[in-house]
Amino acid sequence: MSTLIQPNAPFRADIVGSFLRPQAVKDARAAYAAGTLDTAGLKAAEDEAIRDLVDKQKAAGLQVITDGEFRRSYWHLDFMWGLNGIERRTSRTGYMFHDEETTADTAVVTGPISGENHPFVEHFKFVKALEGKGQVARQTIPAPIQTFSEVTLDRCDGQQESLRAVYKTDEELADAIAAAYRTVIADLYAAGCRNIQFDDCTWGIYCDTDFVAKTGMSPVDLQKVSELGVALNNAAIEGKPDDLVINTHVCRGNYHSTYAFEGGYDPIAPYLFANEDVDAFYLEFDTPRAGGFEPLKHVAPGKKVVLGLVTTKAAELEDEDAIVERIHEAAKYVPLENLYLSPQCGFASCEIGNKLTEDEQWAKIALVKRIAERVWK
């Protein structure tokens, strides 16, 4: 019996969520930033582009639809800025990637954090209304530990002082973030959302043993931050409805076709794969930077793994036979029925996007679909 069609995520031919912004969206956002386009005009441009994107996702045969993150500047910061008690600030520098620095923004705690009236709920309702038969609208948001990590950094003047004026301890901060996420998750569920994805780059940092060594972090320190990440993410998930699927995507950075960190999953697998209460892990495996499949032996029984074997960082199409072979290699550690396929990340984690064309983007999606049909027909 075919297992190609799934009732909810993960899907055999899946995506991470973001897509290249069309020029009309880029132009509208630039005009809005310049003060020559009002909020209504910006929303109209985004709405039109998202409708077109959803049509293309349907035409590609995807079971999942997203808004491509067209209403965001970043995959993570816009969500943080939408929480009560967190504000947008310019950082001293951008995030440092290999050969490139990102735009310079961060998130600063300025008051008690809560999740009421988050703008992403309205964003989701727009996509939900576009669902077709057998399709599921997905909402992607940064993982709770990602928000914790961002606001506890020292990326702009006064960031730490502002945080500690509100939350004296990390424990108080973590509790507040978890509660805020539970509010947003409940509101998304009430809006009809049945698939939420936590995007999480914190684990990519801990995979990079060279970077960790430079920070002076000890094995005990690594264990503590890993346990904190799992505990905070689980606290946000706690009490979710049974029919709400929450998955997570682990990334090593995806900005303008470059990356921030490298290293296999070995350091984090005993914590993340074994203990996080998500339904599935969306994992990068597109280059040797992500290591081998052996850490998948730590995946808890019954959990699902989406193999990110097709890169979004380059236009060249992967060899289908080679990808099929790698899927079967992964099946040595996770049963084939619990494996799925997707690109390694989104196509535009930030609005600048990766270095490929829209046609090349859709060719990647078509490749994922063809391979999934071969493996799970």
Regions picked out by a protein language model, each given a short descriptive name:
Residues M1-K377:
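Domain-level signal for soluble alpha/beta catalytic cores
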